[in-house]
Every structure is written in structure tokens, then in C-alpha cells.
Curated annotation (Swiss-Prot):
Interacts with NUMA1 (via N-terminal end of the coiled-coil domain); this interaction promotes spindle formation in mitosis. Interacts with NUP98. Interacts with MYCBP2. Interacts with USP11. Coiled coil: none annotated. The lineage of its organism: Eukaryota, Metazoa, Chordata, Craniata, Vertebrata. WD repeats lie at residues 37-79, 84-114, 125-157, 168-206, 215-255, 271-301, 310-346. This is mRNA export factor.
């Protein structure tokens, strides 16, 4: 299928400029709605790399599809193409040149989608759903890394049907991130492993989790020299850990903070605690965004250890987020995240992807 979303009405009125849409409880921040959003929960978002002119957004959903939009400078979105898996799509990523998109699915496969030809081919196979997918571009090799609930991490040359390497994980892969030459994988039972990717991928260190509850999302951050130096890890218990790989003072430099919590509705539960569904670092400022089951996004300055902004509450969870390559656009998905089980799923409820102008709100506190 080469195109989707041919309806002309949704998302085209009043969305020509950032922040000019009308507001209600599904969009209290008055952000731009992406046209023709997926028909089921949105599990992952990814913007195109800087090598591609313009901005293109990819979303994977529980409707088994992957969609691509062009995001114009005005903020308006144009549906471009769509591909299908035979199970929910759990993760997506881009090749460094922007010509390919890689997709991971509950159907136990990963695919490579050539955007120029609009053809998708299977490039990976696991014995259980594939939870994470990342493109690795090293000086001496390039490959796709897939993490699965079959407790393996596999590395694939896209020209071969067999993995170039298989690494065993202590448990099911729940989340991962890659910024060369570093990868981090968080697993079930609070497993946490850092890999180095130079020459060939290898395990660098196993880390005792700084969080007491199930890992949900992880994102690597860079130092002032633009090198990966640590990661932020989010859990189902409304908490994020900031962890440096080789900090000068571990007890002082590594810390956790509470987020995505609200005052409880009764005295026996003084606080409602929600899952952190996504973490994304601003590519210019190094500040970060978190999104949660509480239906809010928050912006943070980890160096000043302060909150920069919290959104109004949406009428359903925020399930995923990402920044575009220059940090001007913050994309976030509003859809059910299954954190309360299937009985709270309402198939009549629409799913949304919103775009927000992020240029000013994520500047660190000490920079005016």
C-alpha cells in the first residue's frame, strides 16, 4: 500500500502554525495534530536523521502498521506511506542516511523498509516478539541490533538472513538505546547491561539497577564533547534514574527523581503513581523529556536537577515521544498504553500524535 489517510478533513483545519489548534481535553496544550493517526495504540515514534532534507516522522502501532508522514515547516503533516506487519509494531528506527526504516514486531520479525521503492523485506527473526530495534553505524561495520523477549540480542547485516552475532541476555529485553560506540539494554527482573560497539559489539558492564521496579524505557545522553556518557532509565513506578558510566563521584553524580505522579484520590493512597513510558534527550540542549501513563509530558534539566515544564493532563496516557534532529519539534503520542490491562481499553477512543514547538521550552535554566 503506497498511501494511507486520504481523508481530507482530519487535522487540516486550524493547524497551519505551531500552537494554533483549538483545545479540549484530548489536546489541552493546543499542539498540532498529525493527520491520519494510527487506528490503535501507538507504541513508538522516530524522526528522520539530519542527512535527510526536511522532517519525516515514523510511527508504529498495535494496528500492526508503520506509517510515515512528512512534517512541513508550518507544522502541517502529509501522510506519505504505510507498511504492515502481522503483529503489533513495538519499535522503529532509521538508517543513518535516512533511506531505510527498520521495524520490530510482535510477529517475531524485523523488517527493512526502503522508502524510495516503498518495499519492505524481512531482515531478522526471533523466537518471541522483537521489542527493540536500532541501527548501528560503526567505522568498520554497520548493522541492525534487535532485542527480543526470547532473551537474545542479535546483530544483523541486512544482506544476510543469519545474524552476524547473537548475545544472550539474562532476561527478556524490555528497552534499549544506541549512540555509537555505546548501547544499553534493560531487561525483565531489572537487568541492565552496557555494551561497547567498537570493532564489534561486546558486553562492557552489568549494572545493578538504580530503580526498584520494572524497567520501562531508557535513553543515552552525551557529554559536552558529544560523546555518550550515561543514560536515563524510567520505570513503572514514576521514577527516572540518571546514571553515568564512569562518573568522577558516583554517589553524587548518579541520582533518581520522581515524576508522573499526582495527589491520590483517597487517604489510603496518598499519591497516584504512573509508568514512565518514554524518555527523549534534546539533541542540542541535552535536557530531556519524559512522558507517562498520567497523560502528561515533562521537560527536565538533569544538570541543574530541575523541572522546566509539565504539560496539562491529556485524557489518555502518552505512550511515546521523540525530538526531530535539531530539537525544534517534540512529537508525542496520546493513546492507551495497556498499563491498566485490557479491561480499561476503549477501542472507540481515538489515538493522536501531537507536534509541539520545543525550541525554547527545553533550554537549560542557566542559559537565557
Amino acid at each position: 500500500m503506497s498511501l494511507f489517510g486520504t481523508t481530507s478533513g482530519f487535522g487540516t483545519s486550524g493547524t497551519s502554525m505551531f500552537g494554533s489548534t483549538t483545545t479540549d481535553n484530548h489536546n489541552p496544550m493546543k499542539d498540532i495534530e498529525v493527520t491520519s493517526s494510527p487506528d490503535d495504540s501507538i507504541g513508538c515514534l522516530s524522526f528522520s536523521p539530519p542527512t535527510l532534507p526536511g522532517n519525516f516522522l515514523i510511527a508504529g502501532s498495535w494496528a500492526n502498521d508503520v506509517r510515515c508522514w512528512e512534517v512541513q515547516d508550518s507544522g502541517q503533516t502529509i501522510p506519505k506511506a504505510q507498511q504492515m506487519h502481522t503483529g503489533p509494531v513495538l519499535d522503529v528506527c532509521w538508517s543513518d542516511d535516512g533511506s531505510k526504516v527498520f521495524t520490530a514486531s510482535c510477529d517475531k520479525t524485523a523488517k527493512m523498509w526502503d522508502l524510495n521503492s516503498n518495499q519492505a523485506i524481512q531482515i531478522a527473526q526471533h523466537d518471541a516478539p522483537v521489542k527493540t530495534i536500532h541501527w548501528i553505524k560503526a567505522p568498520n561495520y554497520s548493522c541492525v541490533m534487535t532485542g527480543s523477549w526470547d532473551k537474545t540480542l542479535k546483530f544483523w547485516d541486512t544482506r544476510s538472513s543469519n545474524p552476524m552475532m547473537v548475545l544472550q541476555l539474562p532476561e527478556r529485553c524490555y528497552c534499549a538505546d544506541v549512540i555509537y560506540p555505546m548501547a544499553v539494554v534493560a531487561t525483565a527482573e531489572r537487568g541492565l547491561i552496557v555494551y561497547q560497539l567498537e570493532n564489534q559489539p561486546s558486553e562492557f558492564r552489568r549494572i545493578e539497577s538504580p530503580l526498584k521496579h520494572q524497567h520501562r524505557c531508557v535513553a543515552i545522553f552525551k557529554d559536552k564533547q558529544n560523546k555518550p556518557t550515561g543514560f536515563a532509565l524510567g520505570s513503572i513506578e514514576g521514577r527516572v534514574a540518571i546514571h553515568y558510566i564512569n562518573p568522577p563521584n558516583p554517589a553524587k553524580d548518579n541520582f533518581t527523581f520522581k515524576c508522573h505522579r499526582s495527589n491520590g484520590t483517597n487517604t489510603s493512597a496518598p499519591q497516584d503513581i504512573y509508568a514512565v513510558n518514554g524518555i527523549a534527550f534534546h539533541p542540542v540542549h541535552g535536557t530531556l523529556a519524559t512522558v507517562g501513563s498520567d497523560g502528561r509530558f515533562s521537560f527536565w534539566d538533569k544538570d541543574a536537577r530541575t523541572k522546566l515544564k509539565t504539560s496539562e493532563q491529556l485524557d489518555q496516557p502518552i505512550s511515546a515521544c521523540c525530538f526531530n534532529h535539531n530539537g525544534n519539534i517534540f512529537a508525542y503520542a496520546s493513546s492507551y498504553d495497556w498499563s491498566k490491562g485490557h479491561e480499561f481499553y476503549n477501542p472507540q477512543k481515538k489515538n493522536y500524535i501531537f507536534l509541539r514547538n520545543a525550541a525554547e521550552e527545553l533550554k537549560p535554566r542557566n542559559k537565557k
